[in-house]
Curated annotation (Swiss-Prot):
Family the entry assigns: Belongs to the thioester dehydratase family. FabZ subfamily.
Protein name: 3-hydroxyacyl-[acyl-carrier-protein] dehydratase FabZ
PANTHER family linked: 3-HYDROXYACYL-[ACYL-CARRIER-PROTEIN] DEHYDRATASE (PTHR30272:SF1)
UniProt GO MF annotations: (3R)-hydroxyacyl-[acyl-carrier-protein] dehydratase activity
Length: 159
């Protein structure tokens, strides 16, 4: 049953994120949610380390975190916002749902992300109707925009 969770906690640690999102290593791209306002906005981050497997090939002599993974991190953050806005922190319901991204628009990459960076995802709800959510925002390092995008997603039953 869809609900509106305005009094949701605003911070979630990795143990909470793992109970809501289905992603796992190496594709879980959120370490912590530091701000969440249901139906409105979310701020989360991932610490980028030299130990990321992706740096073995992108690029061995000049490691740059791939832009597509930045967008995926934004998508996961938006999915976390949509789910918790509808059902709050409910791991049992999370086992029955999955977020599918439908469109990714207006993507721009501005500054490379490298090991040692704390990659922050700042997203806000642009609109939503039922299980369809549109979010937009930026990825930032040290307050500087490194990427931006708009994403549309659908929450579906997990089969």
């Amino acid at each position: 049953m869809e609900q509106n969770h305005q009094n949701l906690q605003s911070q979630f640690f990795i143990e909470h994120i793992l109970q809501i999102l289905p992603h796992r290593y190496p594709m879980l791209l959120i370490d912590r949610v530091v701000e969440l306002e249901a139906n409105k906005k979310i701020v989360a981050y991932k610490n980028i380390t030299f130990n990321e497997d992706v740096f073995n090939g992108h690029f061995p002599d000049k490691p740059i975190f791939p832009g597509v993974l930045i967008v995926e991190g934004m998508a996961q953050t938006g999915g976390f916002l949509a789910f918790t806005s509808l059902w709050g922190f409910d791991p049992e319901i999370a086992k029955t749902k999955i977020v599918y991204f439908m469109t990714i628009d207006k993507v721009k990459f501005r500054i490379p992300v490298t090991p040692g960076d704390r990659l922050e995802y700042h997203l806000e709800v642009l609109k939503h109707k039922g299980m369809i959510w549109q979010v937009g925002g930026t990825a930032q390092v040290d307050g500087k925009v490194v990427a931006e995008a708009e994403l549309k997603a659908m929450i579906a039953e997990r089969d």
